[in-house]
């Protein structure tokens, strides 16, 4: 039962970190009339 909770917390933390990095504005790519893939 404890393993399920620890696994859920681990996956949730990694998911939040991945979400923050993936949807972060790319600092090295200036937008010059080109629509970025990450933003809607």
UniProtKB/Swiss-Prot annotation:
Among SUPFAM superfamilies, the record links this protein to: Photosystem II reaction center protein T, PsbT (SSF161029)
Give the transmembrane region(s): 3-23
Cellular component GO terms, alphabetically? Answer: chloroplast thylakoid membrane; photosystem II reaction center
Q: Which Pfam families does the UniProt entry name for this protein?
A: PsbT
User: A GO BP term, please?
Assistant: photosynthesis
Enumerate the subcellular locations listed in this protein's record, separating them with semicolons.
Plastid, Chloroplast thylakoid membrane
Which protein is depicted?
Answer: Photosystem II reaction center protein T
The taxonomic lineage of its organism, from the top, reads: Eukaryota, Viridiplantae, Streptophyta, Embryophyta, Anthocerotophyta
Please state the gene responsible for encoding this protein.
Answer: psbT
